[in-house]
Structure formats: C-alpha cells, structure tokens
Amino acid sequence: SGRYDGGYDLLRQERVTQAEKLGVIPEGATLANYEPLATPWNELSLEQQRRYSRAQEIYASVLEYMDMSIGRIIDYLEETGQLDNTLVLFASDHGGSASESGVDPAASLRDTVNRDNSFENFGRPMSYIDHGEGFAEAATAPFRDYKATLSEGGLRAASFISYPAAIPGGDVSHTFLSLM
C-alpha cells in the first residue's frame, strides 16, 4: 500500500486542508467551479490505480529530493555566514503536468519508442512516465485545471523569496509575480 493509493481526489482535498492550516488560502475555501477532467479514481481499474499511484510516488520523491538539495544549499549558506546577505528565489514551473506518459499505454507512441514503461521499470533508466491528469489537478488545488490551460491551476505556481537582510520572513503574499 502506497502513500497515494487513496487517489487524486483524496489528495486534492488533503492539500486544500493543509493549505488552509498553513494560511496559504483562507479557511473555508471551497473547490468552487471544480469540474474534474480526469476519470474519477473509483472508476479506474485496479491496474490503472496501481500505475497512477506509483507514478505519483515517484514524482513526489523527485520533489522531495529537490527540496532536500535546496536545503543543503541553504544550510551551507547559513554555516558560512552568507545566508542573511543572499537573495534566494525559487519559482516553480506553471501548473501540474497532465501528461499520461507511461501510466496510460495508449498515451503517445513517442512515449513508448525506445522506452521501458513496464510497471517494474517505473522511475528507472529508459522509463518515461508522468503522473497523469488526476494528480495534476490535485497538484494545483485549490485551483482548477493544470499546465497548458488558461485557468489559475495552469498559470499559478509556488514560489518563495528569502532575503533576510531586507525582507522580513514568515508572510504569505498573493501579489502577482512574473519571471518574464
């Protein structure tokens, strides 16, 4: 049993609840105007659920590794006395990817040529997988849709700025930011 075996609908609700607790979105925020584009989790076959769940576990582990690596840089800056005078800017790519690569064998011929997307090879060399539409929708909660759409889920992305010498920490800003 994996962390994401409950599916993307459950994960979406968990993320909204956590975002409320952290003050990122107002308490009592709803998933208004949310019309899931992905097949409901309970309508997927057990094999489909297994593939999507495993792909999401791999995706999450990549993010966890990135987070740990950024932490190592921050730790180094702190240990060497440079953190207070260093501007740290992190910006995520827009929206969650809805690609079905690897999880849906019919997704694209391009995703299967010279690939081994067997379940046993997920996340290993020669695999080319993504976590699919449902987990992309969960990734952008509480917003609607995902990457490549003109909705908040496709346009908004997480970011943070830290510059202890000039910016007080601990605040959440909803100010529009563009890196273009």
Language model region names:
Residues 26, 82-88, 155:
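Loop/turn elements at helix/coil->beta-strand transitions in domains of secreted/extracellular proteins
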Residues 6-12, 17-21, 48-86, 96-98, ...:
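A long, amphipathic alpha-helix that forms part
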Residues 1, 90-98:
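Active-site-proximal loop/short-helix segments
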Residues 38-55, 162-168:
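Short glycine/proline-rich turn/loop motifs
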Residues 2, 74-75, 112-180:
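Substrate-binding rim/cap in mid-to-C-terminal beta-strand-loop elements of soluble/periplasmic
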Residues 28-29, 99-100, 153, 170:
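Short helix/loop capping segments that flank catalytic or ligand/cofactor-binding pockets
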Residues 1-3, 9-44:
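Long, well-ordered, tryptophan-enriched scaffold segments
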